Amino acid sequence: MKSKWMSGLLLVAVGFSFTQVMVHAGETANTEGKTFHIAARNQT
């Protein structure tokens, strides 16, 4: 039960992070590649 709850929470967190990155990239189209690269590097 707990592992299932943790998996769901992790999925929501990842989805939210991805949405935030996409919105930010859309707002700053000029630095889209740079923004995505920084975000990807911060994830690891």
Swiss-Prot record:
Substitution effect: I38P: Restores a sporulation-proficient phenotype in a phrA deletion mutant
InterPro entries hit by this protein: PhrA_inhibitor
Compartments it resides in: Secreted; Cytoplasm
Effect upon mutating A39P: Cannot restore a sporulation-proficient phenotype in a phrA deletion mutant
Post-translational modification comment from the UniProt entry: Secreted with a propeptide domain, which is cleaved in the cell wall by the secreted serine proteases subtilisin and Vpr to produce a mature signaling peptide. Contains a predicted signal peptide cleavage site in the N-terminal region, however the propeptide is probably subject to only one processing event, at the N-terminal end of the mature peptide.
Disulfide partners: none
Activity regulation text: Inhibition of RapA requires a free carboxylate group at the C-terminal end of the PhrA pentapeptide. A free C-terminal carboxylic acid PhrA pentapeptide inhibits RapA phosphatase activity at a 1:1 ratio and is approximately 200 fold more active than a C-terminal amide peptide.
GO biological process: sporulation resulting in formation of a cellular spore
Site label Cleavage, positions: A39, A40
Propeptide stretch(es), residue numbers: 1-39
Protein keywords: Cytoplasm, Secreted, Sporulation
GO CC terms in record: cytoplasm; extracellular region
Family membership noted in the UniProt record: Belongs to the Phr family.
Subunit record text: Interacts with RapA and inhibits its interaction with Spo0F.
Function: Signaling molecule involved in the regulation of sporulation. Secreted during production, but the mature peptide acts intracellularly, indicating that it needs to be imported into the cell to function. Inhibitor of the RapA phosphatase activity. Does not act on RapB.
Protein name: Phosphatase RapA inhibitor
